[in-house]
Amino acid sequence: MESGFTSKDTYLSHFNPRDYLEKYYSFGSRHCAENEILRHLLKNLFKIFCLGAVKGELLIDIGSGPTIYQLLSACESFTEIIVSDYTDQNLWELQKWLKKEPGAFDWSPVVTYVCDLEGNRMKGPEKEEKLRRAIKQVLKCDVTQSQPLGGVSLPPADCLLSTLCLDAACPDLPAYRTALRNLGSLLKPGGFLVMVDALKSSYYMIGEQKFSSLPLGWETVRDAVEEAGYTIEQFEVISQNYSSTTSNNEGLFSLVGRKPGRSE
């Protein structure tokens, strides 16, 4: 592993999901870069899942972290969702929300925003319940392994979703390319790959804790996805940076790729 890049053990010991959620997802009227980015991401995911052709039965979310925002529109297009993450504390945080336990993070402002994007077909609490029903499993994952979800037996997915994950999990470009190929093993022929990530970011902060990120430009991302065997159907660059004290990214991207072959 590249010297100085945040290790897996550091994530297990130092990644605080509550601090992360409060820093990046305390969505509200306050004008800040983090809120603006979240709005962009929610709009992009709405377009991909509700206005586009990305639909099916099974979606696997790779590197979910402690968040559910990325799945709010996806649950309109997929009947079964599997969430996954490397760190146990993120999986516990997801379980707290799924089980509506005391102290679970309040996603209601984000959910209300997505309901508004979707034309207010349902109220926030209904949307949250719909997503809870869709999430069938919470699994451990490691994108650096040839079997990212370990030995769990699953049908090939119609869609893989990965938001703000791969650049934090891969210390260098060869590892990034390998991770993309590893993920392909979970996807059925003709299945979709939906990715969202920061561009040219070498770190991000959670409180006083700095976590490494692999700084990639959009051309490098595009080439790596294509070299891993996917056809890119959509690629959008979001020209919004995080706060300077949070990250040194130069925008973000979202893409929709497709694995070769015909889906059943």
Curated annotation (Swiss-Prot):
Keywords: Citrullination, Cytoplasm, Methyltransferase, S-adenosyl-L-methionine, Transferase. It is found in: Cytoplasm. Nicotinamide binds at residues 197, 213. One of its GO terms (cellular component) is cytosol. Its main location: cytoplasm. Inhibited by 6-methoxynicotinamide (JBSNF-000088). Belongs to the class I-like SAM-binding methyltransferase superfamily. NNMT/PNMT/TEMT family. This is Nicotinamide N-methyltransferase. It comes from Mus musculus (Mouse).
